[in-house]
């Protein structure tokens, strides 16, 4: 394949879909991953289009990740960019947390990222302009009373990505972390916040443009971490 290949892990209606379309617009062939293949098919109008391949993958399962990546290599080629957008925003506290939910949060945010990055590493090292972009959240910086599972997993993810960056930057692989500080506009969040106007939300298309710019940075001025929020967000 002549086009560079980008894997977007964790594609749904919001920023995952916007990231796929933004990188398609920039000339990438996009591998869109989700556990639910029917949702991907609905989003993209099919599981294989000219510039997008939708593939089912359970990012909490190492075997599923390895099988998916082998299929990508056999059918499409070697990717040069990973955008890891998987996660699950749980609301729980020490009073009601389920240890299984806590473990699943870690698997999606940390184990899945590690497994997929390890699969891709040999191909990234031989690629032109290789990168790993991980989508985080404010929960990576601090916990709240009701985000025990989510904040513990996200803070572990952020530390892991820092470690990855310190290893891989000298080898020419740009690893970066994006902290999302706000509510992304989707049909679900719009229904959940019916009294909020557009200024309350982060718009997925605008977010995707900011994130995609990370893979265009010159090596002399790489950013590791950026935070993105709407202008009215209280921070």
Regions found by a protein language model. Name each.
Residues 3-4, 78-79, 93, 124-137, ...:
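Active-site loop of short-chain dehydrogenase/reductase
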Residues 26-42:
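Conserved glycine-rich Rossmann-like NAD(P)H-binding loop of the short-chain dehydrogenase/reductase
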Residues 47-63:
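Rossmann-fold cofactor-recognition segment
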Residues 170-173, 177-179, 193-235:
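C-terminal helical subdomain
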Residues 12-14:
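Conserved glycine-rich cofactor-binding loop
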Residues 93-94, 98-106:
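Substrate-binding pocket helix/loop in short-chain dehydrogenase/reductase
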